[in-house]
Amino acid sequence: MAPEVLPKPQMRGLLAKRLRFHMVTAFVLSLGVAALYKFRVADKRKKAYADFYRNYDAMKDFEEMRKAGIFQSVK
């Protein structure tokens, strides 16, 4: 019986192969996290600001603060 011959290990390009794999993985994961943040946080925040300013009356708030005495220069 002939002894089993082990295959020769690949010695060239190991770092490049690992870097290529990990860079692609990191890029895909970062795109996924950015998309999740946009749809779960940023869009909700943007909608909340739009809803607030849709009905916001700056003059009404100003008059309320003036009547409360917050401003020293406006009587």
UniProtKB/Swiss-Prot annotation:
List the record's Gene Ontology CC terms alphabetically.
mitochondrial inner membrane
How does the protein associate with the membrane?
A: Single-pass membrane protein
- This chain belongs to which protein, by name? Cytochrome c oxidase subunit 6C
For this protein, the record's Gene3D superfamilies field holds:
Mitochondrial cytochrome c oxidase subunit VIc/VIIs (4.10.93.10)
Pathway the protein takes part in = Energy metabolism; oxidative phosphorylation
> Which gene does this sequence derive from?
COX6C
**InterPro entries listed in its UniProt record:** Cytochrome_c_oxidase_VIc, Cytochrome_c_oxidase_VIc/VIIs, Cytochrome_c_oxidase_VIc_sf
Q: What does this protein do?
A: Component of the cytochrome c oxidase, the last enzyme in the mitochondrial electron transport chain which drives oxidative phosphorylation. The respiratory chain contains 3 multisubunit complexes succinate dehydrogenase (complex II, CII), ubiquinol-cytochrome c oxidoreductase (cytochrome b-c1 complex, complex III, CIII) and cytochrome c oxidase (complex IV, CIV), that cooperate to transfer electrons derived from NADH and succinate to molecular oxygen, creating an electrochemical gradient over the inner membrane that drives transmembrane transport and the ATP synthase.
Q: What protein family is recorded? A: Belongs to the cytochrome c oxidase subunit 6c family.
Picking any one GO biological process from the record gives: oxidative phosphorylation
Q: Where in the cell is it found?
A: Mitochondrion inner membrane
Q: Does the keyword Isomerase apply?
A: no
Q: What is its main location?
A: mitochondrion
The record's note on quaternary structure and interaction partners says: Component of the cytochrome c oxidase (complex IV, CIV), a multisubunit enzyme composed of 14 subunits. The complex is composed of a catalytic core of 3 subunits MT-CO1, MT-CO2 and MT-CO3, encoded in the mitochondrial DNA, and 11 supernumerary subunits COX4I, COX5A, COX5B, COX6A, COX6B, COX6C, COX7A, COX7B, COX7C, COX8 and NDUFA4, which are encoded in the nuclear genome.
Report keywords, A-Z: Membrane, Mitochondrion, Mitochondrion inner membrane, Transmembrane, Transmembrane helix
Write out the topological domains of type Mitochondrial intermembrane: 55-75
Those parts of the protein on the Mitochondrial matrix side are 1-13
Report the transmembrane regions from the record. Answer: 14-54
